[in-house]
């Protein structure tokens, strides 16, 4: 997951690109797109030059109109909150980092892309990526390729698959670093948000 | 008479030469007056490096027009910007639109990646010195596992501690402008904007450019507003200010100019029943102007706009010569030959010329080239105008050519009832009252040389400028630091020393940041220090890198390999290398490179709080080769020094003129000067009482006032007998014309013209009223003096 944020920031600092259409209406129809969606994630990273993969896990929430919460619980607890105008990184209650749109105008763009990625909003993603997809009765697969060369170089290739929700995200970077994220236990509606999570929004 | 014809013919030849030379200069050479106000500084104070830094910062900024086209959404903003651009493209060659280089986007980071160990932010450098190894290990682990810990560029092993990523982020924040879809993009809470940097092809101060650019920008903005809903167009540029100023000025020229022309025509008509006198007076002044331009160009090879404008106003005194002759012609017996009349007037005419020329030449003894040029310009102009009167007027105006109008008779009669100044109790009381009032006014007199107080831009322009400044967080082009050194390395090192001083000012919000080449290319010394610092604090055996390996279950081989990868030998990044890469494009203007024997650069300031200027002025004190530059302050100080020198020149001129008058008038010499001196004192007192700060333009007007006032004094003292109306008529006509031509400028809303005009208005009126009071008493029942017919 970190790759996505990092690469997006880096790339967005440099550029962004837009527009075209892909036959993705079927996939769009399969996606549930709830207002509130929370679940569990398991992330595995294979970094260039390292023998062992790095595993981490935690919870995530996507709230329409508000933003994204990404809570890593293991091995080091920390929380990331992305809203329209800022990105805040908490370690416990302490704010370890805050990036707001005033400082960095691309924050809004990053956050909207991330929100789209987690909720599977392909129409939105098309502004930055060439989207190629296929769908059958039980699920769908999509490959994203950044339209701008700089973004493509920074992010590499992104693949998503899922059904009513996004199930897997795979990112392969040009540098050789790879990241796999698996989503599970997805719940929707206001009740899906734990009290401590609701408090953070 | 024949002798005079020869004289007139000779003068006609000279005038033909003048016309030829001027035609050659303006049409052949196409000379353009200097406009840079710093060219008016004494030569030894001019500094080639400073000049070049100005041309990098200010001249470039003068030609720029920055336009932001914004809409609530990005697609709308792009449509509006396209519509805007299409209108601009319809007039090619006027405004050039900068093209965005797509290649520059993709390889933005490449030049830096090879040098990443030496590229650190100030905070990172402090942390490297102060923080324990556990801080760095924890930091790297958090970055490894957390979803987001700032930007990371390339593989983890390239930048395990996130130092390079942090540096890139800090660099990106030097400007909020981002490339997006092949355009430049900024945003605020309400709108997304496309930034259109435009460059004006013609000079910003040329009237043609202003007249063409403004309507074009207006049409473009209208097209943009039609292209999408909620569009906002914000524009700023020197040309917009210049255009606003000249449209205000030309509007005023129309009203004030027409008013004063109508007044002069009516006045002349009612006095002479003819318009010929105006034609003649204008002829003499015109020849004076052309003559001084020729002579100045031959002497100096250049003319400054300020010299031209001020010099031309000072030549205005020359109307007195023509008026004096014409009024005497009117009063004299029509049978009297004009050449003989002139012979009689010659001593007083000569004296007035000499007084004005000597007065103006006082300006030549100041160290400022602008004032010297002005002195030569106006003195030469007066001589030429005077010679025109002397050589041509007697032939052009014969006896009986002029008839006295009703106005002249009524006005002339008023002289007989005018009060006369006699030393006595009443006069002393009046003098004492005057002294008290004047003293009070003077005590409240202040000076203001701030160039900004000479401008009154429309509020719309000011608010656009503020919005633009906020959105772009751009540095000010007129206040910055100039850094010099023997080599580029020395310059970079001094920049770094300066930046250490500026950091606390950023923290104190005096500035929001600074732009410097050393932000991108640290000095070689700093780069070496940083590599050593990173190596010793992070990469050493048992240090954070080894501990990080342990924490994630990697062996010693991993740490060793990563260490070797990071420490791969790198030559330091050099300024020259950086400047040859695309990412340096926005920063190239900061680097002056080698100028003569030194290297120089600019450190520009963003988000300057003007209240903090005194702090900034001294921020670089004590660092060798660092100089604070404030062009606004510089120009203001030039104006201030000109004001002071000119003030002294006025005083010296009074002394010189008095010395000149002494041999002819002896005990009456003071009577010639007193009206002008009193009027000047009173005018300054009025300025003090009405809380108008003193400017260069007030003092300039006082100089002109001395020129005209002395003429009036001489005219009246030459024929003090009150039965002779000719001098009184000449004074009245000259003064009325001066008030109509210069004094009406007091109605102008352009501050410089207002200051000049108001001083002339009050001063001339007072001299006019006072001058008959000081004529010496004559035995008016005795014979008419020998000097009258």
Regions found by a protein language model. Name each.
Chain A
Residues 19-40, 46-51, 197-201:
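N-terminal leader/targeting segments and the immediate start of mature chains
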Residues 1-4:
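Positively charged n-region of N-terminal signal peptides that target proteins for export
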